[in-house]
Amino acid sequence: MDAELPHSMIGSYLNPPERMYLPSFSQTEASQNCHPGSSPKMFNSPNNQALVSALKTLQEKIRRLELERTQAEDNLNLLSREAAQYKKALEEETNERNLAHEELTRQKKDISIQLSSAQSRCILLEKQLEYTKRMVLNVEREKNMILEQQAQLQREKEQDQMKLHAKLEKLDVLEKECLRLTTTQQTAEEKIKYLEEKLKEEEHQRRLFQDRACELQTGLEISKILMSTVSSSKLCNERKKLPKKTNCLKREPPQHTDCRFRGPASERERPPFRMTSSARAEPHSSGEPFSICDNLSELLRTMQDELDQMNMEHRELLRQIAQTGSHSDSEELEQELEHLARKMESKEDQISKLQKHQDRVRKLQEKVENSRINESSGIHGNPKRSKNLKTSPRKCLSETSAFQKDRSFQPVKVHSLPPRLRRDDVKWEQ
């Protein structure tokens, strides 16, 4: 009891002294009224008083314990509620932490993905930068090569212009030679006309001479008939006088004697004159075509030399392509090879055109030479022609006029030659 009293007075863990319950006066009276019969006896003895006080203290302790129990239950309920709230809050906090952790992991993943994409982009940008650097170097190299090619093309253009100028000068020379040929042809035609007129005059004089010879022949025959009737003595005298008479007859008409000597003289002088005219015409007819052919053949040889030079350059480029190792150099050499191949094709076309033109010029010259040979053979050395001149002068005139038409037809071809050659030259240079 003594041990309980100080403990009850001190208090406990569940019921500290400040929270100790002090019973009220009514409660003490009720407790006293519960035992009315024994109160006088109990209060009379000291033990009873101590017992009562102990009971009172015990009752108070029980009450306190009940109160503490109720308080403990309340506290337990409160703690359970607080624990539930704390657990709920903790769960919410853990959920929030999980969500935050998931968000953080997601952000980390996004950041890692972005970082990897940025790294890949940086690598790609570095590759692009290296590629652009190489492209810039290639462009600068190509620019330098293009400038060199332009300079080379400019030099080639100047050389082509010089060649074109030389070809144009050759064409001017050819045109001058062609004009000279036409002038010589015109002079030859004029000489032919003069010779035809002279032939007409000689034909007329020959006819007069033949008529006079026929008259003399008839006179001689008449004199022979008259002389046959005379005696032999007189016939001898007449025969002696006959040459005198014939000489007198020959001396009397000076026109007949002139015609007699003029005819053979003209016949003797005519072939040399024709030979001289033909000799004058032959150098022009032979020399000028040969000069044209020589110029064309020289031009063809120069173009063949250029084509051979291009072939050598083509082989050299093929050798360089086979020896080179870099792709860019091989592409540049292939481009140069294609350009050279196009130039070679154009040069071959030019050579073929020039050969065709040379063949046409040669055929034209052969036609002109054949016509001139036919003309010279028809005028000079054809005996049938001379017989036809004696028998049918009109036929001779018609043949000469026909030949003159052929001669007038030839200069058209000769005149049409230089402009066609000039056009072909312009095509060759293109």
UniProtKB/Swiss-Prot annotation:
The keyword Plastid does not apply. The modification Phosphoserine is found at S45. Keywords: Coiled coil, Cytoplasm, Cytoskeleton, Microtubule, Phosphoprotein. Pfam families: Cep57_CLD (PF14073), Cep57_MT_bd (PF06657). Its main location: cytoplasm. It is found in: Cytoplasm, Cytoskeleton, Microtubule organizing center, Centrosome. One of its GO terms (molecular function) is microtubule binding. Residues 46-213, 290-377 form a coiled coil. Residues 249-272, 362-372, 421-430 have a biased composition (Basic and acidic residues). Transmembrane segments: none annotated. GO terms for cellular component: centrosome; cytoplasm; microtubule. Residues 248-290, 362-430 are annotated as: Disordered. InterPro entries: Centrosomal_MT-associated, Cep57_CLD, Cep57_MT-bd_dom. Belongs to the translokin family. This is Centrosomal protein CEP57L1. It comes from Rattus norvegicus. The lineage of its organism: Eukaryota, Metazoa, Chordata, Craniata, Vertebrata. The gene is Cep57l1.
